[in-house]
Amino acid sequence: MDTIFALATAQGKAGVAVIRLSGPRAYHTACLLAGPDLPSRGLSVRQLKDSQGARLDDGVVLTFAAPASFTGEDVAEFQIHGSLATTEAVLRCLGDLDGLRLAEPGEFTRRALENGKMSLPQVEGLADLIDAETEAQRKQAQAVLNGALGQLAEGWRAKLIRAAALLEAVIDFADEEVPTDVSPEVRALLAEVRADLEHEIAGVRIAERIRTGFEVAIIGPPNAGKSTLLNMLAGREAALTSEVAGTTRDVIEVRMDLGGLPVTLLDTAGLRETGDLVEGMGIALARRRADQADLRVFLTEDVDAMGVELQPDDLHVLPKADQRPDTANAISGVTGQGVDQLVQRISDVLKTRSSSAGIATRERHRVAMKTALDALDRTGTVLESGPDLYDIAAEELRTAIRALESLVGRIGVETLLDEIFASFCLGK
């Protein structure tokens, strides 16, 4: 097994940089740079030197003996001054040593997974935590990283293994002292797991939206003030504004944190009949993105004139509050009048939806759980035929168990791992 190393902190100038090593030569390498009397596990303040004895930097050296480390291997970390030159000097020194190589993206975490220090959902949770931009995303990622989904899946798996064992007992030991009617307990176990799976499957879409972000489309006729409103919400000139109708022809996206939730605001082309080919393409795109959005804000005097059917959660506000005597339910992107109230309304709708989110956060999770649920449905149907078909019921249970094992990364995930770890930095 190679010993790997990489910069664990962000590239660039910083107060502190952390360089991580993992593998059989991690401790030996730490001693080469920091002195021979390092503890096998602990913290030391040392002067780091290269192979010629030249001083590299003063820093903190952390050592972790296997298996009590992040990767499950011997691990060492150098906490040094974060200048580009200092970091490069230490990395260059490590690269010149035999038996060491630069880590691939996510390789430290991959070793943690392979050594049983993390489950696949925890790896996904770590990736999401690194990418988290809002409080809701942080909390969601922390729950998965702390093992919430893995614990659920292991609990379901244990119940299904118990159910399968009961059926196998009837099949293999029918002539001995084994209860002949195990179906009540089996059905009870299936019902418990089935209810949990249905609940989690129902919450995946919203949970995934929290992970990736909600889309909120601003819709209205030309010159209603959509781009001005977008700029007001973004706090910058994200969209070009003009008195000329039809200025916006593409969909302009602005990412923002709205009450702790990740939201992408979409400024769309004004909806109207037009003979301009390019504007017409923009309007068609606007309609498609509006249909796909999680929430739509209609900024218009007359929604019916938009040719779009209102959905229950759609919001309708009147434009240009600064130019009308009655400002009820009206906003102005110029003065900001009514904008805070609109933001609160958007936030309330999305927070209400978010309350139904489950722990599972990805389409992969949903597919695995749906596969298990379908197998449980087939199991229940087969059980109706009595003990003669218990062998088929047991096989369906094994299908469900395998689906749950794929959920936590026990089987069939090699291609998926390559995709996940490609998104990690070298030091993770």
From Swiss-Prot:
InterPro entries in the cross-refs: G_TrmE, GTP-bd, GTP-bd_TrmE_N, GTPase_MnmE, MnmE_dom2, MnmE_helical, P-loop_NTPase, Small_GTP-bd
Protein name: tRNA modification GTPase MnmE
Family to which this protein belongs: Belongs to the TRAFAC class TrmE-Era-EngA-EngB-Septin-like GTPase superfamily. TrmE GTPase family.
Claim: Hydrolase is one of the keywords in the record: yes
Location in the cell: Cytoplasm
Keyword Nucleotide-binding: yes
Sequence positions that bind GTP: 223-228, 242-248, 267-270
Assembly with partners or alone: Homodimer. Heterotetramer of two MnmE and two MnmG subunits.
Entry's EC annotation: 3.6.-.-
Assigned keywords, A-Z: Cytoplasm, GTP-binding, Hydrolase, Magnesium, Metal-binding, Nucleotide-binding, Potassium, tRNA processing
Class in the EC hierarchy, top level: hydrolase
Main localization category: cytoplasm
Residues engaged in binding Mg(2+): 227, 248
